[in-house]
A protein has these predicted regions:
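Gly/Pro-rich, tryptophan- and cysteine-flecked surface segments typical
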Residues: 1-122
Length: 122
């Protein structure tokens, strides 16, 4: 039985702006784990409300490894930046089944909020 799925969709992307305290970095992150014995070749498709999708290819995740991709940092070989306060969806496509979750740390209030969610899989 496969451990994970090849397609994951996370619909609630919205990189929060930075708060007033420079010591804390608000961010979003995509965490992926490969529980198989094969390397996973992964692409990320960012889907927006008002512009064409952006595809980031060339992500590899070795067998029995995990990774965390910070979405507030440059992505891919071209250094694509999401930008703050932009609504988006991430479609994760993998050559082999993986597990994935999405997390957000919002630091705009003193009682910072972090949450993670499992995406829709198929």
């Amino acid at each position: 039985m496969a451990k994970g799925k090849k397609n994951w969709v996370f619909c609630d992307g919205y990189l929060p702006p930075h708060g007033d305290n420079p010591e804390f970095e608000g961010h979003e992150a995509l965490m992926m784990t490969n529980l198989t014995g094969k390397v996973a070749n992964i692409s990320l498709t960012f889907i927006f409300e008002d512009k064409d999708p952006v595809v980031i290819d060339g992500i590899t995740l070795d067998a029995m490894r995990t990774t965390c991709i910070r979405l507030d940092h440059p992505l891919g070989k071209d250094g694509f930046m999401l930008g703050e306060s932009v609504q988006y969806t991430i479609w994760v496509k993998s050559s082999t089944p993986i597990c994935a979750c999405f997390g957000r740390l919002d630091v705009r209030q003193t009682n910072m909020a972090y949450y993670s969610v499992e995406g829709y899989t198929f």
